[in-house]
């Protein structure tokens, strides 16, 4: 068997074992494709064994707000209680996803980093003034939605969150826990 094929089969075995143990890994930018893959796994686990705990491991630089909220909504719809574990990085929309766990079940590994900020629009925006105004209003609505998530998750005031996300705010796992983004730091699998 060629080495590439053998490695692919090994990866399939690993992926199957992790899914069977109700572990979902989100280790890439938040895109429609990555969100769809996560949602399919969530649905699979919910349909095969509803109500059983799921561990959602996040290492993501963030990405699409709409794709991220699609995952968020599905997590909130399922009956299975979800634990989040940030390892590496949860930035931007990745940090928002780290907050969708059941209360008391938002964790990070000791060297994880979390970054929160306001939403942005990439690239060049062109169009009529009215269209640009529509886009501006939409991004402000998105910003308000994200602020609502951070306020609810952290218990911080709206003013504190607005100030915190005005620019990129980077935090260690300890700092994120003090800020209210995490419930604990994991040092062992036994802590799950």
Curated annotation (Swiss-Prot):
Signal peptide: none
GO cellular component: cytoplasm; endopeptidase Clp complex
GO MF annotations in UniProt: ATP-dependent peptidase activity; ATPase binding; serine-type endopeptidase activity
Matching InterPro entries: ClpP (IPR001907), ClpP/crotonase-like_dom_sf (IPR029045), ClpP/TepA (IPR023562), ClpP_His_AS (IPR033135)
PROSITE patterns given in the database record: CLP_PROTEASE_HIS
Chief localisation class: cytoplasm
Keywords: Cytoplasm, Hydrolase, Protease, Serine protease
Pfam families: CLP_protease
Active-site residues, record numbering mapped to chain: 92 (nucleophile), 117
Catalysed reaction equations from the record: Hydrolysis of proteins to small peptides in the presence of ATP and magnesium. alpha-casein is the usual test substrate. In the absence of ATP, only oligopeptides shorter than five residues are hydrolyzed (such as succinyl-Leu-Tyr-|-NHMec, and Leu-Tyr-Leu-|-Tyr-Trp, in which cleavage of the -Tyr-|-Leu- and -Tyr-|-Trp bonds also occurs)
Source organism, top-level taxon: Bacteria
Localisation: Cytoplasm
Binding partners and assembly: Fourteen ClpP subunits assemble into 2 heptameric rings which stack back to back to give a disk-like structure with a central cavity, resembling the structure of eukaryotic proteasomes.
NCBIfam families: PRK12553.1
Family (UniProt): Belongs to the peptidase S14 family.
Known function: Cleaves peptides in various proteins in a process that requires ATP hydrolysis. Has a chymotrypsin-like activity. Plays a major role in the degradation of misfolded proteins.
Name of the protein described by the UniProt record: ATP-dependent Clp protease proteolytic subunit 1
Species, as recorded: Chlamydia trachomatis serovar D (strain ATCC VR-885 / DSM 19411 / UW-3/Cx)
Gene: clpP1
């Amino acid at each position: 068997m060629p080495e590439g094929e053998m490695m692919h089969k090994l990866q399939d075995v690993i992926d199957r074992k992790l899914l069977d143990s109700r572990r979902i890994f989100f280790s890439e930018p938040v895109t429609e494709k990555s969100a769809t893959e996560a949602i399919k796994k969530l649905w699979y686990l919910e349909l095969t064994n509803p109500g059983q705990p799921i561990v959602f491991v996040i290492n993501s630089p963030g990405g699409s707000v709409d794709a991220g909220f699609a995952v968020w909504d599905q997590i909130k719809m399922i009956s299975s209680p979800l634990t989040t574990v940030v390892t590496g990085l949860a930035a931007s929309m990745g940090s928002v996803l780290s907050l969708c766990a059941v209360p008391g079940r938002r964790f990070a590994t000791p060297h994880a980093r979390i970054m929160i900020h306001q939403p942005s629009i990439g690239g060049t925006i062109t169009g009529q003034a009215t269209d640009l105004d529509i886009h501006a209003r939409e991004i402000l609505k998105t910003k308000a939605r994200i602020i609502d998530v951070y306020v609810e998750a952290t218990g911080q005031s709206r003013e504190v969150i607005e100030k915190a996300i005005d620019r990129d705010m980077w935090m260690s796992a300890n700092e994120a826990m003090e800020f209210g983004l995490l419930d604990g730091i994991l040092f062992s699998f036994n802590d799950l």
